[in-house]
Amino acid sequence: MFPSSAENSGKCCSQPLFGSFASSESFETSGSDRYGAYESIGLGTLITEDSDSVFDNSNGGYSDTCSSTWAADMLGLDRPFAMSSQRSRSPFSDSGRESQHSTSNLSDSSSLHSPSHSRPAPIGSRGRDMHPYGQRNYRGRGAVVHEAKGQSVGCSCENPSIWIERYCSASPTLVFRGTKRKMMEPVPPCTLVKKKRIVRAAPSKSNIVGPHILEDSCLSSDAKEINGEHELGKKVRAREKRRRRREKNHEKYGDKHRLAFTCAFCKFHTFEDKDIEKHFGSTYHRETLDYIRRQAKFDDKVISFLHDCMVNKFHKTVSNLHKLKFSCGRSKDEWAKIMEGVTEDDYMRRMEVVYCVACDVHIPVLFSSVQQHLHSLTHLKSKVAYKEQLKRDSVVTAKAIINNDNVKERYEKYMKGEDPFATDAKDTSSDSQDANRSDEAEEDEEENSDS
């Protein structure tokens, strides 16, 4: 029933035998009489014979005892549980097992036909149902036997059980400790394999519940609220700028600063109509218009239209002054209100002053004081810097005026040869209000450019 050692040595092993482990073989042989595989389980022979027949038919040449032993271990159903109570207690079982696997005596029933589960698990074993040291072709647990080139030791290089699991079975292959998982099925070499694309199912609308249903509407409403707050804040800032500008003009020119004669390009301000007429014919005013034409790249018709706008504004202001019978001087009641609470002990006197816009300084109406400030180094430097600043501001003001909607309509009439300022009294009053508003907007833009 059992093959002899001579037959096994002729089939499986062709290398010289290791005879230095005779003592350990004797101990293992004595223990195999009590713990043999065929004595403990009756199905051992049947399984071994079936496995031998499978290997003979499928991979002809794997009918040796070593192959049948490993197949019996792999195809055994409940043998680990049946043999768990019959494990060897011999302290020399491991050493004897090593010697048997290293020698050619493969006929010993205790080492070849008994499964690895019936032996004490050595260090490095993964426990029950897992065979240790798979990387050594299942030849033992001792030192690795170095093979010479062209020679084979023991069984074939590939174990039949692995061949069965890889080619004849649909179950996944064994994974040992330290090996990497195979994420894709093995493919033949020189074959382009496209990586499988992971498609994630998008959540359906029916599954969306709660506040997410109106997500788009909420976002749109939030955007509208943000835009509304932005527009409101913009209007508030513009209103504050106009208020500060009015206060500044009130400090400079008094309560009637809106009824003064002004030139928006040259920033000329006066309460005398003769002074403003003189300014419109001055060289300084013409130089300012030429500077605007060069910097803004306007045509001559645009420059002449802007000049006519300033002249028309002057005529409107004159007509309004005649209607209101306005005088630039202050009345006695106004002076009394201003000087209220002032006594002789305070040593305060009312007098006229000269205001220097370039230096932002008030000078007493005295010849010596005015001449001293006129020839001072501070005034000379401030005068040059202020003139350059006025030129830059004039370009910004001209662009703001020409881009106004009302001014655009007038400019179209002006280009057609019509009189753009020939309107009735109602339109004139509304235009004057619009002009004042546009002037305030222009002043706001000038403040932004200064900052």
UniProtKB/Swiss-Prot annotation:
Entry coiled-coil feature ranges: none
Chief location bin: nucleus
Motif residue range(s): Bipartite nuclear localization signal: 180-200
Biased composition (Basic and acidic residues): 413-439
Bias (Basic residues) ranges: 235-247
Pfam families: AKAP95 (PF04988)
Extent of Acidic residues compositional bias: 440-451
Listed GO CC annotations: DBIRD complex; nucleus
Any one GO BP annotation for this protein: mRNA processing
Lineage top rank: taxon: Eukaryota
Localization: Nucleus
Region of interest (Disordered), ranges: 83-137, 229-251, 413-451
Biased composition (Low complexity): 84-94, 101-118
GO function term, MF aspect, one: zinc ion binding
Keyword Signal: no
Assigned keywords, A-Z: DNA-binding, Metal-binding, mRNA processing, mRNA splicing, Nucleus, Repeat, Zinc, Zinc-finger
Zinc finger residue extent: C2H2 AKAP95-type: 263-285, 356-379
UniProt family annotation: Belongs to the AKAP95 family.
Assembly description: Component of the DBIRD complex.
Role: Core component of the DBIRD complex, a multiprotein complex that acts at the interface between core mRNP particles and RNA polymerase II (RNAPII) and integrates transcript elongation with the regulation of alternative splicing.
Record-given protein name: DBIRD complex subunit ZNF326
Annotated source species: Danio rerio (Zebrafish)
